[in-house]
Amino acid sequence: INHGLHRIHVVDLDGAKASSPQNLDTLRTLAAVEGVEIEWGGGIKTEQALADVFAAGASYAVVGSVAAQRPERFEAWLQKYGADRMVLGADVKQGRVSVNGWQEEVDLTIDQLIDRFLPYGLSQVICTDVSRDGMLQGPATDLYVRLQKKYPTVDITVSGGISCMDDIISLQSLGLRKVIVGKAIYEGRIALKDLQVNELTRGQVNG
């Protein structure tokens, strides 16, 4: 917050494994910090789980596996809770969407997944290139640029591979609007003060 970052992306890994949110107390603690918006994902498989996440203070809910495997459920959530609060989480592996912690692939491309929900107002997508996540080898730039050009009304958030400020500056110059930065911060490759002055990352950091 001291560096101007107000949107924190958090993945409940325990929740993803258990198929239901497991760290709501942590969410409540984070959400209680003034000036912070929490973007929370992991284990949101039912409407009760979604309601619990919002009740615990999340500003945004990231839904991945359900959107790919039970699309009618995600459509209903977009309509009930609003596209401004619902984020489509799409993990991509070799061109196909992966679900359930990257353990399974479904017969869908990222484009098909986005197309399914556009009529319901979808406006936020976090796309993670599984092969690059946590590798610090640079993002799959071509993928993100193509998606952002194809879907100008959707904010395509870059996730995976960010290794340095040059990666972020390059993405910004190519028209990308949002990026999640995690491991590069933890390992000291990117300083929070540098993110503060960059428009692409202002307001969003991975937690």
Predicted regions and their residues:
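Conserved, mostly hydrophobic/aromatic
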Residues: 8, 53, 88, 125, ...
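Catalytic domains of carbohydrate-active enzymes, especially glycoside hydrolases
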Residues: 1-11, 119-121, 125
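Glycine-rich, proline-tolerant flexible connector loops at the mouths of alpha/beta enzymes
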Residues: 7-26, 127-137
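Charged helix-capping and loop-helix junction motifs
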Residues: 21-28, 103-112, 137-146
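Short, acidic/polar
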Residues: 1, 45-51, 106-116
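Conserved anion-binding
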Residues: 58-133
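Catalytic cores of alpha/beta
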Residues: 26, 33-34, 38-60, 142-178
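C-terminal helical cap(s) of enzyme catalytic domains, especially alpha/beta-barrels
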Residues: 72-81, 172-207
